[in-house]
Amino acid sequence: MPPRILLSLTLLLSACAQPLPPLPADLVRVALDSGTRADMRAYRLDGELVRQLRFPDLPPGTHELQVRYQFEVPGGMGGLGQLSEPRRRTCILGIEGELSAGEHYRVTAYRLGWQPVGYLEDAAGERLVRASVIRCGPGV
């Protein structure tokens, strides 16, 4: 591989691996955790579309967070009695909660059958608010 391409690739990959800067004491950080075989992305913050994968650091107060959660569900019976491949299901989950300055929070989600279950947790992992399912299906 030519050195220029190798250097460019190294710089590109190292930019993705940068740790987040320390959280200022007057802001709130919300991380996303979807576990394995699933994907969670920031969708809306206080009604406004988020154009990043995660939420920006927020001022303290009450916020409405929405995430797009995509997870695998088992396939059904295909033709000739064979099991079909697992399918991806996409849902929008909403959480409204009071966030305190200087704190780290995490939105977690998992699937329970065909339905998602999500929570807002504090830094210690204590569940604070259960997420509501806003909608699921194609085009979400």
Language-model region placement:
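Short loop/turn and low-complexity linker motifs enriched in small/turn-promoting residues
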Residues: 16-140
